Amino acid sequence: MEISKPKGSTWTDDQWKAIVSSGRDILVAAAAGSGKTAVLVERIIRKITDQERPVDVDRLLVVTFTNASAAEMKHRIGEALEKELAENPGSLHLRRQLALLNKASISTLHSFCLQVIRKYYYLIDVDPAFRIADQTEGELLGDEVLDELFEEEYKKGNPAFFELVDRYTTDRHDLDLQHLVKRVYEFSRSHPDPEGWLHSLAELYDAASDTKVEALPFYSYIKEDIALVLEGMRQKLTRALDLTKQPGGPAPRAENFLDDLAQIDRLIQQQDDFSALHELVPTVSFQRLKPCKGDEYDPRLVDEAADLRNSAKKQLEKLKSDYFSRTPEQHLESLREMKPVIQTLVQLVLEYGRRFAEAKKEKAIVDFSDLEHDCLAILSVKNPAGEAVPSEAAKFYRHQFHEVLVDEYQDTNLVQEAILKLVAKEEHEGNLFMVGDVKQSIYRFRLAEPLLFLSKYKRFTDDGSGSGQKIDLNKNFRSRSDILDSTNFLFKQLMGEKVGEVEYDEQAELKLGASYPPNEATKTELLLIETPSGAPGEEAEELEAVQLEARAMAGQIRRLITEKFQVYDAKAKASRNIQYRDIVVLLRSMPWAPQIMDEFKQQGIPVYANLSTGYFEATEVSVTLSLLKIIDNAYQDIPLASVLRSPVVGLDENELSLIRIKDKKAPFYEAMKAYLAAADGDERLSEKLRRFDGLLKKWRAYAKNHSVAELIWEIYRDTKYLDYVGGMPGGKQRQANLRALYDRARSYEATSFRGLFRFLRFIERMQERGDDLGTARALSEQEDVVRLMTIHSSKGLEFPVVFTAGLGRNFNMMDLNKSYLLDKELGFGTKFIHPKWRISYPTLPLIAMKKKLRRELLSEELRVLYVALTRAKEKLYLVGTAKDKEKLLADWRTQAAGSEWLLPDYERFQAKSYLDFIGPALMRHRDMDESGAPPVIDEIREHPARFQVSWLSAADLQAEAVDQAGEERHDRLVQIQMGHAIEGAFEYEQQVRERLAWSYPYKDAAKVRTKQSVSEMKRQKEYEDEYGDRSLIRPSQEALLFKRPSFMMAKGLTAAERGTAMHTVMQHIPLTRTPEKNELSRLLDRLVEKELLTEDQRAAIEEDDILAFFDTEIGQKLFGARRVEREVPFNMTLSAKEVYPDLESADEPVLIQGIIDCLFETEDGFYLLDYKTDRIHGKYRNGFEGAEPILRKRYETQIQLYARAVETMIKMPLKGRALYFFDGGHVLLF
């Protein structure tokens, strides 16, 4: 029985249905911005708080896609429970739920798998102390296992293995075959039964002598592709024929086009018969077009018709080269010849998998793939028919979980689906609740399988009468109507069953759910930039495109900010001016991000991007890694030269040349040794090299007995490189980078690997895989900046204004050009490779997979575009570059022809970029009428979507309009750089001379500090006395490597540290009576406990010196004082003339700061007392008598300033001023 929606509820009917429906498996197709997370949380809360049948939270399995999503889910549930508890404070059930929440199964599926394995490890013979391996550690272990396997196979001399090697390796190495083995193994792990899938691979190549191509298991994809191409050709030729009937059309060529159509129709009639097509396709010939000359023919229509025909001819040639360049028998023979090779490959992969699993077991490690498969092994057993059925462990979980709820179900893979089926109840019991949006399935590269979602969506019914219930949430509560209308307009034309994998029908369309105040400026804008043709190379074109797009976006952003574009603030329930933080730029991938950031910064636009790159390129990291490489093996020229040229050794190019000249052919290390052995070398250079070579030998010996992390730290200590980089620009970040390398080494030591060589290989694998620790960011995500991010990173987020850039960039289809392809359904497709002649060509399975995977990749790209467009709340910009505007528009017109909403499958299948999708769709909109839009049905033309299309040229996008004066300044700068005379310069000659002769009138004031401490003034006076000038900083001598600063070389406590310790004791000692020695010792111990003194300072204190102070006359005065103030701070302003008497024009005020050790008041007045720890005995010839005049002179300025400050504060003269010297117990009165 369904629960009726309460009156006043803000949930839509469909949302309410998703919240309360039960008793069957439920699939919720939640469109972008439809509130799916809120619905999921509400469903969970209602189950927990149900008055009649409440469910404990730990009896729900909630599976999320990321750890962050799981944490957010727990947080939301916790908040909802606390709110319920506030309304029902006496509820023990709610208190219990809050207590259970932390251990509830709300996590990623990997985390749930880990939980299952920890509980049932004994069922699959796994070490209970296992840990999850680092990805790089797993790869290195796999490499070792594979190397050992290949070495054994070579020793065996197995002919089948050698044939495999001959076909899949080069004459230099067998790395290609090793990569193939690992790739097939890893791909097999995406299947619930990896071994079964591997054994099926060779079946694809079963081709008996009587087999027909049409009977092969993959032929349906070839047949579909042939039909698609032929239909596309037919549509192009039909369109060309239609053009002949238009006024000004190429009427004489109608006969040509009719003949072409007749030939294509014959092919279409035979498209199910591969052999017949093989005979017919070569017979098709396109006759020479009849001439169309004269004013009666429209050149545009003539050219368009010819282009359509040429396009059809090219497609026919492609069809020939793909399928019909070889006979059907030759195709079948290739399969027969490759079958035993595939079988050998499968056996090799199986053996690798067995050994890899054994190696991981020995080291008690698992990887993420193992988590899923080990969990699957625990939850399933094979029945007599060999089918996987729930084990006792699975039955436990089926009983344990009242409901299994899966978020982002569209991103589930086949193994995860198998696990979910085992822990959920059977379909007729229905406790599986799945939420997702297949239109946002963008993780196929992680082997997600959107077809799982689609198959259920097609199978389930609205009322749940079948095997499950489907519920559509298509009301969007995020975006304005302009965003929704433009998205719907595009995707109704682009997303279909064949390209897109889902029909964008009425159920899939986004419906308006949000309420915004009116704003006429929110129509979707398409910014198209026409780039000059003929740019030198693809890389130059790419660079130019990103700069132009960045410049166009910067201009629009400035306009939005300047014109105070209004965005709606939901919290304030009012509109406000746009801020930079409201804007995001979305990219398919991040290679363009640095250039866009640079351009934005030049235009004064604050920008932020989470760039996780640049760490290994950082100079300090590169130098340290080079140093580690030559410690491992000094005979590596590039790393060695890098270290010698770096600040670690500090050679310049001339010095490197001198070394190389000693031995021009030997490795550089040998040349270095030759230079050291030579008697005629430069002494300074030789000394540098000797010291470095000595350190290199020391480090090599050190590396044998210490960890890599210890070695790195030893290098930092010996070279002082960590300290050195701290003084460079960005020093803190550079030091953090070096510490990160040390931390990376420590984490490496925590793996199953050891040693420097393996660590370097470990780092190389990280770099090969594109892993990067990244560099710290100067701007946080909370600041008012424009964000740059990938479309994948933006999933689940929303922004008031979205720029989707790079729409003209070609899709990455490089994987389709490999010599082999893998597919979960079809298996393994490979080129035929002749072992002797090295001739290769694609087999039919490879061609079939290429067509299938291309369609899947295009479908994924469409979904990525959908995600990008649906991030926008109020304003959407689409930005792209194109080369030839007129040609592009003509192509779009051709592709846009047709009366159906959905653009032809064939045209969409040819798309190479997002613009190839968007352009033809936009050509059918009324806003494109001026571009010669093709005739379409009124429903399309009158769609409510609003677009504004702007074509910009490169000239329009110069970095702010350059005025005439700016051009003149630029020309003069060029003349100066070239050494040419500047015309008209005499006009400014006098002004130039006056400016060059000008002298700053306040040079003396620049030497004056505006704030100075008393101690600094005392030291300044000492330097004046001893050296007669104020040069407190003197140049240091050049040193090899980096000399440790004197303060870092000090052993024990410095004089200043001892003085600080004595002052601390005098600040805290009780002043009621002379303390006993044991009392003083206890006081010192307490100061150490309170961390006011260190152990070293405690040990340095002479207790007798402190006790002797209280035997003096001034010490006794303290006991009878009315008031005692210790550590008295003061500020006082003096004229600069008093502080710097030698300066002529120094009349600026100077702030003087100081701290008085002790100020006390007796019956006869105030006394100032300062403690000194200067060494006297053993330093001065006549003891204190000889020291007194020197000490009096040294501290006279300080005491005078202290006295002046105190007398100003107390407004009366001091009775006495004294210094007490602990060394000897002497008092100096002033």
UniProtKB/Swiss-Prot annotation:
The gene is addA. The lineage of its organism: Bacteria, Bacillati, Bacillota, Bacilli, Bacillales. One of its GO terms (biological process) is double-strand break repair via homologous recombination. InterPro entries: AddA, DNA_helicase_UvrD-like_C, DNA_helicase_UvrD/REP, P-loop_NTPase, PDDEXK-like_dom_sf, PDDEXK_AddAB-type, Restrct_endonuc-II-like, UvrD-like_ATP-bd. Its cofactor is Mg(2+). Residues 507-796 form the UvrD-like helicase C-terminal domain. ATP binds at residues 30-37. NCBIfam families: addA_Gpos. This is ATP-dependent helicase/nuclease subunit A.
